[in-house]
Amino acid sequence: MFNDQCSMKIIYYSSPFYADCDFPLIGELQRKGHDVRYYISIASFSKRSTLIDIKELYPHTGIYPATKIYQEFNEFRNFLDLSQVYVVNQKYKQKFHPVNLLLMVRLVIHFLMQKPDVIHLTKAPCLTQKLFYLARKKLVLTVHDPFLHSGATNKMTERDRRMAFKKIPKQVLLNNRQSSAFASYYHVPDNHIFINKLGMYSSILYVDPLPFQSDRPFILFFGQIVEYKGVEYLLEAMKRVHSRYPELMLVIAGGGKYYFDIEPYKKLDYVKIINRYIGTGELAGMLRACEFGVCPYKDATQSGVIQTAFTLGVPMVVTNVGALAVAVQHNITGLVVNPCDVNDLANGIMELYSNKEKLNAMRTHIKEEWKKDMGWESIADSYLKCYENP
């Protein structure tokens, strides 16, 4: 299974949505001497996402060396071998467009002709991507969401997921809390499931933070606005917080369409809504300036938001859904409150804001203890064991 000198040839195919956890993993695998070729799919709807901030889409469909068409990738040259990074560029955003269907056929052939040891995917194949199943023994799938989020379900996506879980022999879950329920619900044999974790989102440390101007202390929600994230509960909780701590602001930063009437909240002088893509430098500035972060999710798996915040030493108030209560240790690195409970969320925010000694102790614990456990070397080793497993 190995190439010369026990080096593996790994093709890693992903999307910008996972760049903040893909980049450090791929960099670590490359540093270990493996031939890792990273392919990232970019379209109009994904060109500004997590670490990727591409202002203008290259106007042709095809497979290209990343730096040939997007100079923005040069920002990551210090921790990725950019000569091994390629863009799967989609001029047309419709996945059923004939040009995109043909591109996926070309991509599968392109991968197979390289004769890799492993083809690592981060999303279940759909449409003509299902040709990947011709090489099913080489496939590894990272299952970022063992269960689909509320509001994100559709029959085609679920059908594609079920096919992937049936056909792909190695499936990596990023927390242990949901593995039994996942295996039972999707009828996945235990020996097909490998447990790993997210590490420190170290890429944000390489970016110069843009100072965030605020004349009041503030707490921060950041990320894409989608229904499962429970922003409406946070806004209602903030009304109660404001009655006791009128100086405290809430900043909600992220693109996406609001799924409830946001207009009444825009009128509140203690709520600042920034409804657009937030670049990494801008986010770093917000995180360095905030009191702490909040994840009021209604349901979840694990969350890259927590990894990003902790990388910069920022404690979190989170709800007890998915594996968030595993990622955040209650009273140690943050607080865990009940989901969809305005009172409990408000009480958690007020408790942490009012206790500066506790908040500072959490910051210290994150910097001195959490980071010890979140290096990518051991995570990369776990992936290699998965790849090598017969």
Would you name each region that the model predicts?
Residues 168-193:
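A short, active-site helix/loop in glycosyltransferases that binds the activated sugar's phosphate group
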Residues 308, 321-331, 335-336:
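Short acidic/histidine- and often glycine-rich active-site loop of Leloir-type glycosyltransferases
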Residues 212-229, 235-238:
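Conserved donor-binding/catalytic core segment of Leloir-type glycosyltransferases
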Residues 217, 247, 344, 351, ...:
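A short, well-ordered alpha-helix in the C-terminal region of glycosyltransferases
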Residues 285-302, 314:
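Acidic donor-binding loop of glycosyltransferase active sites
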Residues 261-284:
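Nucleotide-activated donor-binding/catalytic signature segment of Leloir-type glycosyltransferases, i.e.
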Residues 34, 152-153, 183-184, 191-216, ...:
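Acidic anion/phosphate-binding donor-loop and adjacent secondary structure
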Residues 273, 330-331, 335-342, 349-356:
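Conserved acidic donor-binding segment of nucleotide-sugar-dependent glycosyltransferases
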